[in-house]
């Protein structure tokens, strides 16, 4: 079986790699992706352009710039960005580089400033990007046409959107509406947001770490139910040994997820995907106390999912919203082909009690934090995979687990919740969601290449999968 994509017939190794990167063939039973898409440095440069800079990417949550003149720095691929809130309460985003000689303006992660002054030559800008003052800009130091009609203001992000507090940006001025980009994953994000009739907030503090591996390793792993019992066996065993009647941390019981087959996976448009499970002990989660209010506000079926199901939601290409052992926003920033930065935050309903907030944070620290029982395990596997991918003896990663029971379209759980996934995995260990995501990756990359015919000598062909 083959899917018509766009590829070239010229000598470009990058183009040829993308064209043959993914096999998604039910007839032959080949469901796999090439390992060198994780190691090719030339390919990485095009990923930054087509996957990150021309796509919508997550920038921040609006609670991180809650007050007038708050700012937070972020990235759209290789482009440094400042997200600001002005005195009128409006949130906007500009490139974090002085319009004079390109020096980075904001050199701290976040703060509160009504103006930004470049440390290099002293130019001053409003926090919405307008050039206010040029050092020694009077008299005849500059030509007559200098700073006309905003020519030297900071560069605004071409596309900027706020979906219910989640802020996204793109360097593509023709990016589709954010709701269209989110597609079917929007309903899952709504489940997270609707846990409170009020607002969510990102809690103070964050953790950032860099691992030695490609960015796609983390994007796969956040929805990989297959690795839990082997990589996180120590955490699973620890949970099994804990006395849940004592005053120790009470957390989600992960010991029965795989044994009882109480979960699955969904893939959505634009590379988004979901890993979900049914909770054996939902009473340990903070949202459990809101179940009656939720039923009245969002309906019994959705309330049941919010309270009794976990969610590992990937908003492709750089965001995970985790709602399981605790609640986490995980932001992925590629640095190079084999180096990736991850920044993690805990989020919560703004109106929850101190007791519930403390329990949430303890659960978060237990597994998610850099010093928790989960993160170090994953980072070692990312390093080991990246090292193994450098070998050339075997070219492919097998992604066929669960293929006999993958479902095209929604399963019963999805239909009950009004979801419309492209594909459903009947078990949480199923790997079909990675095949779908990498297929979208290849399609997006090849569409970008098609727009550069002079570079790639592009012609339409059939790309075997």
Curated annotation (Swiss-Prot):
Binding site for [2Fe-2S] cluster: 98, 100, 118, 121
Domain Rieske stretches: 56-154
Catalytic activity: a 2-halobenzoate + NADH + O2 + H(+) = a halide anion + catechol + CO2 + NAD(+)
Biological-process GO terms, alphabetical: benzoate catabolic process via CoA ligation
A Pfam family reported for this protein in Swiss-Prot or TrEMBL: Rieske
Cofactor(s) of this protein: [2Fe-2S] cluster; Fe(2+)
Keywords for this protein: 2Fe-2S, Aromatic hydrocarbons catabolism, Dioxygenase, Iron, Iron-sulfur, Metal-binding, NAD, Oxidoreductase, Plasmid
GO molecular function: 2 iron, 2 sulfur cluster binding; 2-chlorobenzoate 1,2-dioxygenase activity; iron ion binding
Pathway the protein takes part in: Xenobiotic degradation; benzoate degradation via CoA ligation
E.C. numbers: 1.14.12.13
Binding site for Fe cation: 227, 232
Cofactor mode of binding and number, as noted: Binds 1 [2Fe-2S] cluster per subunit.
CDD domains: RHO_alpha_C_AntDO-like
Function, in words: Component of 2-halobenzoate dioxygenase multicomponent enzyme system which catalyzes the incorporation of both atoms of molecular oxygen into 2-halobenzoate to form catechol.
Subunit structure, as described in the record: Heterohexamer of 3 large (CbdA) subunits and 3 small (CbdB) subunits. The heterohexamer is part of 2-halobenzoate dioxygenase two component enzyme system. The other component is a NADH:acceptor reductase (CdbC).
Entry similarity comment: Belongs to the bacterial ring-hydroxylating dioxygenase alpha subunit family.
Protein name: 2-halobenzoate 1,2-dioxygenase large subunit
Organism ancestry: Bacteria, Pseudomonadati, Pseudomonadota, Betaproteobacteria, Burkholderiales
